[in-house]
Amino acid sequence: MPEELTPTPETAVVEAGPVSRWLSENGFENTALERDHLGVEIVQVDREVLLPIAAALFAYGFNYLQCQGGYDLGPGQDLVSFYHLTKVSDDASQPQEVRVKVFLPRHDPKVPPVFWIWKGADWQERETFDMYGIQFEGHPNLKRILMPEDWVGWPLRKDYISPDFYELQDAY
């Protein structure tokens, strides 16, 4: 008798949530990922379709960018840019939320900015650039926001090696 294959977290099929289904029904390619511990739907998209999908989600009612950030999956692995969106309205007792993730190759971490859709992304994208080196191509003011301008490297990458010494210059 053949052995049954037990699905692992890597092979388990994730049921598409309402946002993923809506995107698919409207011709936007996406992949449903497992919901987070709070039950927030997570959708993976390619960087080439991030802007059209972001604009569609804004038109669909996701009018608030709660958070934009990044993280590193580990040395030699992808970097991730994520966008936590919320539908804010006067009559919502429980606002709908979705998290959009874009997985970027470490050697080419480029993605378009969503600043043009949600103005609050401005400094959040700059922080993600500053800490992880994710390039938001077309951002109007993409420069370091936390680290000194002459800092070398991306401090929150898991393969970052801290310098032994860095001398801060007086501002005056």
From Swiss-Prot:
It comes from the Bacteria. Keywords: Membrane, NAD, NADP, Plastoquinone, Quinone, Thylakoid, Translocase, Transport. Pfam families: Complex1_30kDa. Its EC number is 7.1.1.-. It is found in: Cellular thylakoid membrane. GO terms for biological process: photosynthesis, light reaction. It is a peripheral membrane protein. InterPro entries: NADH_DH_suC, NADH_quin_OxRdtase_su_C/D-like, NADH_UbQ_OxRdtase_30kDa_su, NADH_UbQ_OxRdtase_CS. It is an enzyme of class 7 (translocase). GO terms for molecular function: NADH dehydrogenase (ubiquinone) activity; quinone binding. Gene3D superfamilies: NADH:ubiquinone oxidoreductase, 30kDa subunit. SUPFAM superfamilies: Nqo5-like. GO terms for cellular component: plasma membrane-derived thylakoid membrane. Its main location: membrane. It catalyses: a plastoquinone + NADH + (n+1) H(+)(in) = a plastoquinol + NAD(+) + n H(+)(out); a plastoquinone + NADPH + (n+1) H(+)(in) = a plastoquinol + NADP(+) + n H(+)(out). Belongs to the complex I 30 kDa subunit family. NDH-1 can be composed of about 15 different subunits; different subcomplexes with different compositions have been identified which probably have different functions. NDH-1 shuttles electrons from an unknown electron donor, via FMN and iron-sulfur (Fe-S) centers, to quinones in the respiratory and/or the photosynthetic chain. The immediate electron acceptor for the enzyme in this species is believed to be plastoquinone. Couples the redox reaction to proton translocation, and thus conserves the redox energy in a proton gradient. Cyanobacterial NDH-1 also plays a role in inorganic carbon-concentration. This is NAD(P)H-quinone oxidoreductase subunit J. The lineage of its organism: Bacteria, Bacillati, Cyanobacteriota, Cyanophyceae, Synechococcales.
